[in-house]
């Protein structure tokens, strides 16, 4: 069994989330262990069919970049804590109109993971965990356009709302009795509350399944390589503005792609993943994810707090 790094749960806006800093998402960090990580996520969406009348209040960025910094502490065999702070860049482009957007601090998250199931066998290890915690409104909410008019809440780096994140993760190593084949499922939701200005962004649900194979592993497990296909389902509920539901702003999307992790040395992984839109719903103002690219690096270490 490889020396595992924890899964970093990244989701600060209704976008496809990058699978985290480890090839297996269910295990927590080892007791007394620490981890620092950086994850870079690029997301593009198609243009709205018609936005000649201005920026719709439910518009999503046509391009966004999120750089996530996190630190994780494994304080118990089955528990760990993660603090995540994102830096977000949003851009909105429309035909015949200047591009608007900007960069700012995103909403921070404080997450706790609990592994409630582990079973070892000759085939491999099966593990399951839950993760939960608040998303705190630390993000910037004052981006404006060229006329100094406030951009919609959906284009701001921060939401202005205190939301709740909950996830369930399952990892099954040794699929079909192949010890190098790993099935990994991440199912999570971000439950939204009203934010700024008088906007409640639609809550999000995401299910991501990754089937990875380890074609290379050094004898001392210091270096390894995982690669495999991923399938992601995204669901966004309709936004609400001033108490009025914005029908057609939410929808569903299906992404397919590939993700690869490489262990460079003990405790250090780098990863790269790409996903593309294969199917989506067609709400009046729904802007599905078209392409999703992410890469990152993580390093684990021991923490001596007392």
Each model region followed by its residue ranges:
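Sec/Tat signal peptide C-region and signal peptidase I cleavage site
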Residues: 14-18
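Short loop/turn motifs that connect adjacent beta-strands in outer-membrane beta-barrel proteins
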Residues: 24-32, 78, 117-127, 175-181, ...
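Residue-level signature of outer-membrane beta-barrel architecture
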Residues: 29, 40, 73, 85, ...
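Surface-exposed strand-loop-strand hairpins of Gram-negative outer-membrane beta-barrel proteins
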Residues: 41-66, 154-155, 249
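Transmembrane beta-barrel strands of outer-membrane/channel proteins
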Residues: 38-44, 83-87, 128-136, 168, ...
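Hydrophobic, lipid-facing positions within transmembrane beta-strands of outer-membrane proteins
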Residues: 34, 65-69, 106-112, 128, ...
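Outer-membrane pore/translocation modules
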Residues: 90-202
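Outer membrane beta-barrel transmembrane domains
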Residues: 47-57, 197-306
